[in-house]
Amino acid sequence: MGKVKIKRKSTLIDMTAMSDVTVLLLTFFMLTSTFLQKEPTVVNTPSSVSEIKVPVSNLMTVLVSAQDPTKTDVNTEGKVFISFAGDVDSVWSSTNLRVAVLKEAEKLFEEHRGKKLNLTPMQYAEFSKMNMFGVPFENLPALLDMESTKRDKFQGDMTNPQVGIPIDDNKDPGKNLNDFQIWLQAVQNVAQDFRSQKREAMAEKGASEEEIQNMESLYKSLIRTGEGIAVKADQNTKFEVVHRVFDNLQTMSLNKFSLMTALKSEDEPKVTTNEGE
């Protein structure tokens, strides 16, 4: 009796479909992921149970560093930095927002200090690419002229007295604005101007009032709801320093803002919303 021969099957497998799925998944994650932005210093936020997530667009972040443990700097209590993130569309992207705020801050600095920065187009372009900055206005041109790695190293030196945006206890929003308050006023002016321009443009196209309000994302986030203002302070920073930041925000009529925290069981930053009285 003859043996039954088992037909050999090919071990080759067509992986075309699997490769297509892999490429699609990789593309999806690349497009939807939010990359962590570089910050001048590591800030360990305090813990809380809040699960409100920080927005990724139309956001102004105020970072307050920890105390200088070496006590070698006159400002050992913590230094202030600012970053701006615009909308996801090309009309009011982070690049456009940063340049607009810088130009407005330049005008306000001249108005309140009687000095001109005389920034160049190249310096505007450099500022538009910066995620976070923290120097007095007088040192801003020199900072923008630095090569990026040298700039990061310069701002990362928490013992340098030239690092950190100057802030004080000024309560008068009409005059004698400190550097921090000038930036706050600048971003408000930009949000107001952009709101007016957008309202006029949409009204001409026949948009309804509801549609217009839905498009006021920058103004709504920064001024109306305060969702777009986040204070990120180190858990070891003195309360007086953080409170001074809060006072300055309220002096400039930014009474709604968020304090970034970390969940006790997670490391992802969350926020606790605070509203000034």
Q: Where are each of the predicted segments found?
A:
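Generic cytosolic/nucleocytoplasmic N-terminal low-complexity/intrinsically disordered segments
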Residues: G2-R8, E204, T273
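Hydrophobic single transmembrane helices highlighted by the model
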Residues: K3-P40
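Long, low-hydrophobicity, acidic/polar, solvent-exposed interaction domains
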Residues: L36-E277
